[in-house]
């Protein structure tokens, strides 16, 4: 076997399959594009689903890639096992209806064993296969130097996730030798394919050849697919470990440089103490995931991807604490991650200035979060005492763990000091529920969707002419599909999919909704209503139409757009470009578009940004867009190659993929973007631009909704009506007086609130005067014990504050019946002798409650206000008992 590092192994895989006619697909963003079923890209095939389900036909049916991926559904295993990671790379080769087993297996063997490539000794390789798939077994055994007896049948070697494509798979295992054997020879798992450390799975090849139809349970009865596919996956980290003879993935060149830096920062040594090794591994794994995710545009937050990043960062910080790293340190690991991955992912080092500030901010914020977690725990302990509870609920403990990053062990220790326990059974349930939610969010990876044979096989040419004209005469009907079948004609009343040889109808794409309109005869008679237009797999525009008259293949028709809708959508699309540029100019040049929706009545624009956009900034953005509308800038476009477009300064949409030829839309000298949609001819056509709202829709992603033209005018008229109504309520003579009237109203309200507080304080003082007159004695201590009903805790505290000022006794206990609940507060002037917390604990059972606090002040709550008198009466008994100790 050759001596190869991780970069060489990755590149050799890609080079090999490129030599076999495969196109190298670049590693795509970890943030899925147009796939809401996935939280992250979680496998090599995840970015290729559009090819396998037939929604897009690839330029080359042979594809290979090295795809960065994230999976967090087993996050708790990271650091405790040899090969669990949240971030990893998958090497893969794929065939979309092209080659199959007879090519895939010999190529796999060649890559693995040929001295020109990996050069692995054949005797170290073992193969598992599906028992009924004898073809696969025979193909492996026919390879040069294949060792007899190294094929093992496995009943679970059949890939099937429900209805849709399925098929047998074959796995390649590498024998690491007796040195790594962790089970006795007679253990049922001690074989290639079992759960052991000696035989390591390094490659899985799926033969997608059957169609799992609804109602079928026996895979031997699945029918063959018309297009058979190949999907393979080789985990880079695993393969590197065998080339470097490493005990686990963490002792390879992908991880060790990070571990060495953590050693330097902590003063600890990796490999010395098992628990500390877990922390080394967690930090090393998590910083890789966080670095790549932030580089791809994800940001920490409370939901979705943002929550995952925040959780990974917090886990890394907590494990840093376990290694006695007290200061922020994670940013120092980012350049090391970038250097390790530089050969294939140069963007990490290029994006350091974007990645490091995010981690720095989040790490600093987490220190405050830890403090907040401690405060919450204090509140929970206090509440438990009030409610006479003996436990902190598992739900609350999980909130401390999940939201504040507070370890369960720390919660248990703090609770024990307060005489409480933690409901760990309920905590475990909350943890399990969250893991199930995470797995659901990841979604079942459906490698291939149903293959729509009718659409995939459609190769008829169709040209979109809508950039230059809004109607077409003598368009020919090139294809008709009814009920998923190609037909020669369709009848009135049917819903059909139509393809024309040329069309002015824009197909929904890039956030812009599709055109609508009519199919007409030469005399203007409407033959069909077009309600939607989408891109077919072979890039034709496919029109969803409700037929009013019969239509047939070859028939000549006229195509007419709904011009009111088309013009409104085009104007709003131009407005999104103006808004995009205004955001870059006013806020920051590194803002990325994160999505958009262009409708006739309004537009929606999503963009990457931390935190809300201030109102003043939104005003500047709105003013700039309206200025460019007033400037009457011409809107033009050219078609050119992608490199020329970049030289022109055209902005690409973050995460989008482009072909060799691109369309660049320019709005004067103000904005240039890659774009395939329709636009106004001049910005003056927009008339007016008005922002309706700005909001957050996820971690680090903001959304602006806006209107233009007539919609903007209507909105302003509605605002004017509301303002007039407010003026009427406030008795304002002019609309301009409304703000001053509101300020007057607020000031009046504040004055009333002050008067209420003043009266409350006076009432408390009067109550204090009365109860301070009744000082009691018990043992050697003086005390006051009184009940004042309908008081809040704050009211009771004010009485205690007044008591401290007057120093009239050694102890005070005040109780109140507030809405059927009993409240007690106690304060001690001699906390070293009479602890307020102990007094409250002693008397609170009388009100069926519990409580506690500091030696100088404590409080309790209970559900039996009828017991207040008994509780107060028992104070003397408690104080007398102190003399006897």
Swiss-Prot record:
This is Alanine--tRNA ligase. GO terms for biological process: alanyl-tRNA aminoacylation. It comes from Oenococcus oeni (strain ATCC BAA-331 / PSU-1). The gene is alaS. GO terms for molecular function: alanine-tRNA ligase activity; aminoacyl-tRNA deacylase activity; ATP binding; catalytic activity, acting on a protein; transferase activity; tRNA binding. Catalyzes the attachment of alanine to tRNA(Ala) in a two-step reaction: alanine is first activated by ATP to form Ala-AMP and then transferred to the acceptor end of tRNA(Ala). Also edits incorrectly charged Ser-tRNA(Ala) and Gly-tRNA(Ala) via its editing domain. Belongs to the class-II aminoacyl-tRNA synthetase family. InterPro entries: aa-tRNA-synth_II/BPL/LPL (IPR045864), Ala-tRNA-lgiase_IIc (IPR002318), Ala-tRNA-ligase_IIc_anticod-bd (IPR018162), Ala-tRNA-synth_IIc_core (IPR018165), Ala-tRNA-synth_IIc_N (IPR018164), Ala-tRNA_ligase (IPR050058), Ala_tRNA_ligase_euk/bac (IPR023033), DHHA1_dom (IPR003156). GO terms for cellular component: cytosol. Keywords: Aminoacyl-tRNA synthetase, ATP-binding, Cytoplasm, Ligase, Nucleotide-binding, Protein biosynthesis, RNA-binding, tRNA-binding. It is an enzyme of class 6 (ligase). It comes from the Bacteria. HAMAP family: Ala_tRNA_synth_B (MF_00036_B).
């Amino acid at each position: 076997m050759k001596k190869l590092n991780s970069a060489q192994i990755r590149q050799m895989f890609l080079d090999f399959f490129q030599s076999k006619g495969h196109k190298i697909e670049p590693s795509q963003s970890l943030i899925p594009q147009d796939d809401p079923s996935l939280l992250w890209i979680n496998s090599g095939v995840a970015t290729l689903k559009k090819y396998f389900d037939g929604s897009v036909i690839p330029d080359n049916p042979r594809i290979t890639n090295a795809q960065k991926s994230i999976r967090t559904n087993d996050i708790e295993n990271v650091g405790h096992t040899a090969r669990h990671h949240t971030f990893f790379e998958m090497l893969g080769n794929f065939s979309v209806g092209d080659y199959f087993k007879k090519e895939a297996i010999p190529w796999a063997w060649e890559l693995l064993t040929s001295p020109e490539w990996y050069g692995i000794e054949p005797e170290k390789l073992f193969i598992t296969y599906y028992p009924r798939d004898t073809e696969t077994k025979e193909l492996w055994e026919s390879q040069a130097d294949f060792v007899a007896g190294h094929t093992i049948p496995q009943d679970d070697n059949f890939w099937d996730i429900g209805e849709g494509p399925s098929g047998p798979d074959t796995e390649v295992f590498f024998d690491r030798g007796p040195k790594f054997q962790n089970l006795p020879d007679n253990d049922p798992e001690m074989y290639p394919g079992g759960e052991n450390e000696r035989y390591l799975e390094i490659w899985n090849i799926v033969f997608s050849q059957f169609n799992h139809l609804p109602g079928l349970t026996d895979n031997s009865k699945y029918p063959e697919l018309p297009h058979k596919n190949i999907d393979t996956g080789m985990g880079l980290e695993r393969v590197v470990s065998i080339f470097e003879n490493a005990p686990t993935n963490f002792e390879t060149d992908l991880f060790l440089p990070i571990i060495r830096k953590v050693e330097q920062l902590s003063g600890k040594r990796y490999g010395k103490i098992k628990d500390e090794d877990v922390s080394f591994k967690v930090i090393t794994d998590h910083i890789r995931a966080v670095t790549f995710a932030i580089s791809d545009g994800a940001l920490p937050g409370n939901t979705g991807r943002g929550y995952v990043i925040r959780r990974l960062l917090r886990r890394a910080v907590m494990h840093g604490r376990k290694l006695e790293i007290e200061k922020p340190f994670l940013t120092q690991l980012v350049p090391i991650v970038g250097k390790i991955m530089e050969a294939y992912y140069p963007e990490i080092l290029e994006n350091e200035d974007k990645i490091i500030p995010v981690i720095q901010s989040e790490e600093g914020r987490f220190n405050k979060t830890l403090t907040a977690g401690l405060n919450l725990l204090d509140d929970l302990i206090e509440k438990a005492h009030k409610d006479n509870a003996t436990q902190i609920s598992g739900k609350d403990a999980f909130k401390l763990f999940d939201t504040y990053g507070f370890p369960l062990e720390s919660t248990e220790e703090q609770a024990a000091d307060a005489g409480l326990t933690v409901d760990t059974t309920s905590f475990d349930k909350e943890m399990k529920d969250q893991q199930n939610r995470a797995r659901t969010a990841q979604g079942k990876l459906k490698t291939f969707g149903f293959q729509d044979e009718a659409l995939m096989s459609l190769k008829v040419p169709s040209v979109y002419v809508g950039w230059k004209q809004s109607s077409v005469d003598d368009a020919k009907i090139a294809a008709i599909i009814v009920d998923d079948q190609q037909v020669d004609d369709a009848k009135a009343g049917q819903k059909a999919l139509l393809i024309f040889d040329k069309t002015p109808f824009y197909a929904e794409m890039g956030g812009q909704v599709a055109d609508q309109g009519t199919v007409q005869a030469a005399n203007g008679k409407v033959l069909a209503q077009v309600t939607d237009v989408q891109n077919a797999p072979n890039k034709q525009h496919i029109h969803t139409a409700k037929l009013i008259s019969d239509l047939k293949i070859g028939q000549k028709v006229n195509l007419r757009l709904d011009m009111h809708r088309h013009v409104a959508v085009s104007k709003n699309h131009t407005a999104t470009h103006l808004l995009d540029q205004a955001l870059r100019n006013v806020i920051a040049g590194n803002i990325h578009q994160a999505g958009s929706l262009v409708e006739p009545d309004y537009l929606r624009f999503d963009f990457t940004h931390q935190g809300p956009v201030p109102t003043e900034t939104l005003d500047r953005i709105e003013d700039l867009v309206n200025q460019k509308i007033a400037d009457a800038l011409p809107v033009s476009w050219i078609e050119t190659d992608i490199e020329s477009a970049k030289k022109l300064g055209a902005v690409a949409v973050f995460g989008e993929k482009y072909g060799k030829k691109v369309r660049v839309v320019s709005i004067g000298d103000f904005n240039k973007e890659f774009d395939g949609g329709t636009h106004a001819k001049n910005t003056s056509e927009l008339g007016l631009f008005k922002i309706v709202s700005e909001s957050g829709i996820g971690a680090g992603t903001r959304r602006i909704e806006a209107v233009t033209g007539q919609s903007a005018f209507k909105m302003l008229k509605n605002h004017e009506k509301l303002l007039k109504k407010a003026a009427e309520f406030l008795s304002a003579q002019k609309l301009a007086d409304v703000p001053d009237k509101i300020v007057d109203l607020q000031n009046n309200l504040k004055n009333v609130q002050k008067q209420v507080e003043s009266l409350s304080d006076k009432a408390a003082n009067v109550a204090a005067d009365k109860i301070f007159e009744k000082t009691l004695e018990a043992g050697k201590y003086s005390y006051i014990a009184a009940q004042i009903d309908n008081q809040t805790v704050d009211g009771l505290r004010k009485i205690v504050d007044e008591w401290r000022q007057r120093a009239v006794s050694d102890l005070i206990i005040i109780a109140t019946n507030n809405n059927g609940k009993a409240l007690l507060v106690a304060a001690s002037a001699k906390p070293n002798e009479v602890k307020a917390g102990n007094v409250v604990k002693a008397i609170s059972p009388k009100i069926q409650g519990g409580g506690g606090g500091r030696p100088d002040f404590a409080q309790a709550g209970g559900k039996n206000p009828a017991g207040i008198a008994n509780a107060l009466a028992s104070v003397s008994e408690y104080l007398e008992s102190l003399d006897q100790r």
